[in-house]
Swiss-Prot record:
UniProt remark on domains: Binds to DNA motifs with the sequence 5'-GCG(T/G)GGGCG-3' via its C2H2-type zinc fingers. The first, most N-terminal zinc finger binds to the 3'-GCG motif, the middle zinc finger interacts with the central TGG motif, and the C-terminal zinc finger binds to the 5'-GCG motif. Binds double-stranded target DNA, irrespective of the cytosine methylation status. Has reduced affinity for target DNA where the cytosines have been oxidized to 5-hydroxymethylcytosine. Does not bind target DNA where the cytosines have been oxidized to 5-formylcytosine or 5-carboxylcytosine.
Disulfide bonds, paired cysteine numbers: none
Organism, scientific name: Coturnix japonica (Japanese quail)
Gene: EGR1
GO cellular component, one term: nucleus
One Pfam family of this chain: DUF3432
Site features described as Interaction with DNA, chain residue numbers: 3, 7, 13, 31, 35, 59, 63, 69
SUPFAM superfamilies assigned to the protein according to its UniProt record, in alphabetical order: beta-beta-alpha zinc fingers
Extent of Basic residues compositional bias: 69-79
Zinc finger boundaries on the chain: C2H2-type: 1-18, 24-46, 52-74
Protein's UniProt name: Early growth response protein 1
Function of the protein: Transcriptional regulator. Recognizes and binds to the DNA sequence 5'-GCG(T/G)GGGCG-3'(EGR-site) in the promoter region of target genes. Binds double-stranded target DNA, irrespective of the cytosine methylation status. Regulates the transcription of numerous target genes, and thereby plays an important role in regulating the response to growth factors, DNA damage, and ischemia. Plays a role in the regulation of cell survival, proliferation and cell death. Mediates responses to ischemia and hypoxia; regulates the expression of proteins that are involved in inflammatory processes.
PROSITE patterns: ZINC_FINGER_C2H2_1, ZINC_FINGER_C2H2_2
Keyword Metal-binding annotated: yes
Amino acid sequence: CDRRFSRSDELTRHIRIHTGQKPFQCRICMRNFSRSDHLTTHIRTHTGEKPFACDICGRKFARSDERKRHTKIHLRQKDKKVEKAASVSTTSSPVAAYSSSVATSYSSSIATTYPSPVRTVYSSPASSSYPSPAHTAFPSPSIATTYPSGTATFQTQVATSFPSPAVTNNFSSQVTSALSDMTSTFSPRTIEIC
């Protein structure tokens, strides 16, 4: 093949792929390997040696990739605890319901950080997050505060927009009653949208 290598040992290892040469043999079961590190890992299956220990629970593994895969189990457990704690705290605070995702890092001797996106929780559509007219702690602009006379302003806009008196009369009477109904039924934010 046309592959090039900067080191001769890499070239030698690669050539073994093409030739099928396996110069490293296990003395216990006579199995052959193309790389010495694969033989070393294989011998651990016979000796029971497990040099890689989990930093969290202490479980030991023969290969480092097995420990790395095992460590992810602990991280998923921590992520679930963080999500559960986040969902509990967001239900008590209306501001936290719109928080962005948070990256959490877990330190270990592996020297790797694992981001943990915290699920964003939104309040259900049934309970409105907009303040109702009864709440005075959350000032929200309404038609009454934005326009001193909401119905009069709307009537004059309709009258100037539509020169026909028939159209003006139809809209002004319906709008006046609709606005008074809206003011008593909906929150200020809903009136603004309408």
